[in-house]
Curated annotation (Swiss-Prot):
Function: Part of the ABC transporter complex GlcSTUV involved in glucose uptake. Responsible for the translocation of the substrate across the membrane.
UniProt keyword annotation of Disulfide bond present: no
Name listed for the protein in its UniProt record: Glucose import system permease protein GlcU
ABC transmembrane type-1 domain location: 71-269
Amino acid sequence: MDKKMRPVIKASLHYLALAIVSVIWLIPVYAMLINGFKSNFEVLSTPVLVPPTKITFEAYVSVLLSLAKPLINSLIIVIPTSFISAFLGAMGAYFFYTLSYSFSRASSAISDVLFSLISLATFIPQEATLLPLTRLIVSMGLLDSYIGIIFALLIFYIPTGALLMSMFISVIPRSLIEAAKMDGTGDLKIFMKIVFPLSMPGFISTLIFIIIQAWNNFFIPLVLVTTPGMKLTSIAVLSYSGAYGTLYNDTFAAGMVASIIPLAIFVFLGRYFIRGLMALGGGGKGV
């Protein structure tokens, strides 16, 4: 009887843990959602998790009107940044992969050194690059421009893409690449026809990760944007809290609106993200 009940107890504890984690994760989302439907007075006079006594849409309407341009700006910047970072990161990961399996010991050593530098670059705080990054963007005449912000984000997210994609590309069977090279296929064609399609689950996982990171990035747009028309969502939300007071219902509504796109991406594409991680954990069986 004990042996029969053991799997049931184990499964029950598993689902209980998932339920607890889900509730903890959903509490901030719930708080943002319901407080956006309150008046500013009610937000201040009632507990944060208590539903509104009277639902009002004023905060959400006001926020949607004021955040329309920042939302568009964020999409214009985040979409190309994410795809370019993930794709170039995949190409870089394949470059390290081919070097590490080279017959030359020097090439393998160079690959290890370069990959270590790339890995180290992902841990450098963006704040530490404030002065050189700003001077670079200003000298290029790209301050307050989409290209300037995208370029700055690429500096940080291409290494991230390479680091993540290297984990997925490294589990691709070496025999496939060697067979293609024996047929006279070039590295670029091998990457486009063999490596990239096989590592697609990893590419999608990397893409989702970079999209969420780029969407939530606060430092880069804070430094490189000086005009209101170029504000991104992460910066625009900050405008609801100032030295002369805070519109709490608008702040909650703005936080909810700003979170909709990354939340939607993870809800609809989260299974591909998990599939990519499972493929990696299975030694590439799902890749």
